[in-house]
């Protein structure tokens, strides 16, 4: 049996202690300005040196999580500075979370967005967290289990343009930069095989009649996922809100042109992400 990537100790066993606890409390109180962030990052660095490879059991964005901040930039942010974790994007999502809201978190990592949406949206919301990297998926599933949120489902696969087994490129320095594309991965990226599905296949398997919002953090593969979906899916399945990682790659510019042609309008752009809404939703 393969070794689990989540420590089996009861939750709370790895609660922050000593210098690490002091640093964590301080970093979470740091403001969002330049000086506040510099201070938070300095204190975080000190805490990480003390912590070593051990995990942390914390509450982040309202959810209990076991985080491994040395392995993944997203987990480092969730542990020490959740106030910096895509705050404008989360606010945009929170405005829309009501009733039987359907949200897909694609490239869910350990559940930051998914668990935020689950807790904010209430028990009637339907949250699907999609994470392809097996070791990160284990941590995602663990965090969902700890949260007690029955409205979140985790799926271990990659989204791509065709159904079938695919190759993932895993950045050894940051598991959050895992991708089906070589773009952005380091030259010594580890390669693994994982199941792949199209977004339309996934939506049909889940029985979705609509998608209220989707977040994509898939390291340059956004066009591979969205273009065949827009081509083949019924209009009623087009997401009302799209939040995706923003890069300067030409493929992203092509995708933005495609989104505008389908009636999407840009409503938010941050240093890392861009968000679009369907114009018909604003009528």
Predicted regions and their residues:
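Phosphate/nucleotide-binding beta-alpha loop and adjacent structural elements of enzyme active sites
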Residues: 1-283
């Amino acid at each position: 049996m393969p070794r689990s990537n989540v420590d089996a100790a009861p939750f709370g066993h790895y609660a922050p202690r000593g210098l690490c606890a002091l640093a964590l409390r301080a970093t979470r109180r740091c403001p969002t300005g330049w000086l506040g962030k510099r201070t938070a990052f300095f204190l975080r660095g000190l805490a990480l040196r003390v912590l070593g490879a051990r995990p942390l059991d914390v509450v982040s964005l309202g959810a209990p999580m076991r985080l491994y901040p040395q392995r993944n930039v997203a987990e480092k942010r969730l542990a020490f500075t959740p106030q910096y974790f895509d705050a404008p994007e989360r606010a945009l999502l929170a405005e829309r979370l009501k009733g039987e809201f359907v949200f897909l978190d694609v490239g869910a990592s350990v559940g930051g967005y998914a668990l935020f949406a689950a807790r904010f949206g209430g028990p009637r919301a339907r949250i699907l967290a999609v994470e392809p990297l097996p070791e990160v998926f284990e941590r995602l599933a663990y965090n969902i289990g700890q949260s007690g949120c029955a409205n979140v489902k985790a799926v271990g696969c990659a989204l791509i343009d065709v159904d079938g087994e695919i190759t993932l490129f895993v950045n050894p320095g940051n598991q959050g930069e895992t991708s089906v594309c070589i773009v952005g991965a380091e030259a010594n990226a580890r390669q693994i095989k994982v199941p792949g599905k199209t977004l339309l296949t996934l939506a049909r398997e889940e029985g979705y009649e609509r998608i209220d919002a989707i977040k994509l953090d898939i390291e340059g593969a956004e066009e591979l996922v969205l273009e065949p979906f827009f081509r083949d899916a019924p209009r009623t399945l087009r997401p009302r809100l799209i939040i995706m990682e923003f890069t300067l790659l030409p493929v992203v510019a092509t995708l933005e042109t495609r989104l505008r042609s389908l009636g999407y309008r840009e409503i938010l752009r941050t240093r890392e992400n861009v968000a679009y809404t369907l114009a018909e939703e604003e009528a």
